[in-house]
Every structure is written in structure tokens, then in C-alpha cells.
């Protein structure tokens, strides 16, 4: 392998939507940083059967609904 061409691979902490945390190795951030998830298997409709509440992070859902309101879906 060539030296100094690969990103730094280190431990980070991942925080799920329910507050649980775990450590994984990643190239994201710096050693010891915490990645907070907006959507995870506990809250994603594909894994919950659509029973989880849809979160409007940053107003994206509202913007989409307003943009396509006249189509009658």
C-alpha cells in the first residue's frame, strides 16, 4: 500500500435517536467525536412498518408537501 493516501480510521461514538450510544471505527470526524443520528433503524419507516412519526428535520418534509400539494397524492 502507498503511504499517506488513506484517510484516518479511528473510533467515534454514534448516538441513536433513542439515546443509546455505541463505538464504531470510521473515517468520519476526529477520534472521539460523536455522530448524532436523525434517522436510525428505530425510527425509519422502512424498519418500523411506517409506525414511526415522520420527523421534519430542517423543514424538508413541509417544503416537499407545499411544493407538491396540488398533485393530489
From Swiss-Prot:
Q: Which InterPro entries match?
A: Ribosomal_bL28/bL31-like_sf, Ribosomal_bL31, Ribosomal_bL31_A, Ribosomal_bL31_sf
GO MF entries: rRNA binding; structural constituent of ribosome
Q: Which cellular component terms (GO) are annotated to the entry?
A: ribonucleoprotein complex; ribosome
- Give the domain of life: Bacteria
- Biological process, per Gene Ontology: translation
UniProt keyword annotations, A-Z: Ribonucleoprotein, Ribosomal protein, RNA-binding, rRNA-binding
**Where in the chain are disulfide-linked cysteines found?**
none
Indicate whether Flavoprotein appears among the record's keywords: no
Q: Which Pfam families match?
A: Ribosomal_L31 (PF01197)
Family matches, as PANTHER family: 50S RIBOSOMAL PROTEIN L31, CHLOROPLASTIC, LARGE RIBOSOMAL SUBUNIT PROTEIN BL31A
Q: How does this polypeptide assemble, per the annotation?
A: Part of the 50S ribosomal subunit.
- Could you tell me what this protein does? Binds the 23S rRNA.
Family (UniProt): Belongs to the bacterial ribosomal protein bL31 family. Type A subfamily.
Question: What HAMAP family does the record tag this protein with?
Answer: Ribosomal_bL31_1
This protein is called Large ribosomal subunit protein bL31
